[in-house]
Amino acid sequence: MSREVRAAIDGARKGGASEIVVNDSHWDMRNVLWDEMPADVRVISGGRKPLSMTQGLGEGFTGAMFIGYHAKAGDRNGVLGHTYTGETIYNVRVNGVECSEALLNAAMAGYYGIPLLLVTGDRVVAEHVTAHMPWVTGVVVKEGIGHYAADSMTPEAACKAIRDAAAQAVKDAPKAKPFTFDPPLTLEIDTTHAEQADFIELMPGYQRTGGRTVRFDARDYPEIFRAFTAAFRLGGAANVRA
């Protein structure tokens, strides 16, 4: 992971990027080896961030890059496919659009006027993202053989592909567009089990619309994103047996 992040940094610099922030976002959000990062890069690390994978976003950034992403829950041949948490979330829709982590996070960046420039991962997530954002450069570093198996590039080959693509993506940034959902906004979550929806509907603003489905209406996307983050965390409490 650290090598691929460093490759993206080096490529972005070659393309003209001057300031870079890394938000460590996989699993417990403590994966990136800081001593392998350039001295002038800022690193956001640690779990339970208020805005999770999108912590640190704000006005002033030229673009975002998603490194090491995966397919959404339920996608065939998506390597380790899930949407934030496989234990609790089966499907997420915003305004009727089925969303992966990449789409959910890209829309948060889009709220601040930041376009997604690059995504790396398996073919399934690359095709999912570019179908919604054709200006995004997708770097396919592995082909899924199933949920737990993949035909992958070597780390050296993957890093070269990421480095080259990141450089070009920064150069092409003026052609990219922020990804957004038009208001009014509706979030729908299908949980893995009905008991998780039992917990989520306890929160103000959520409506139960099905056995495993809840709905939340909002005025802007940050409200949608915060509601989603709260939902998967509270819904996860249903997985704990006292």
Protein language model regions, located:
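Short catalytic helix/loop segments, enriched in acidic residues and glycine
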Residues: 1-10
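Residues at the starts of beta-strands that form the adenosine-phosphate
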Residues: 18-19, 115
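Short internal beta-strands
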Residues: 20-24
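Glycine-rich loop at the start of a catalytic domain that most often binds anionic cofactors/ligands
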Residues: 28-41
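Short, well-ordered, mixed-charge alpha-helical segments that flank or form enzyme active sites
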Residues: 29-32, 72-77, 124-129
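Divalent-metal (Mg2+/Mn2+/Ca2+)-assisted nucleotide/phosphate chemistry catalytic cores
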Residues: 39-43, 50-119, 137-138
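Active-site rim beta-loop-alpha module in soluble metabolic enzymes
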Residues: 111-116, 120-123, 127-168
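C-terminal accessory domains and tails appended to enzymatic cores
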Residues: 158-242
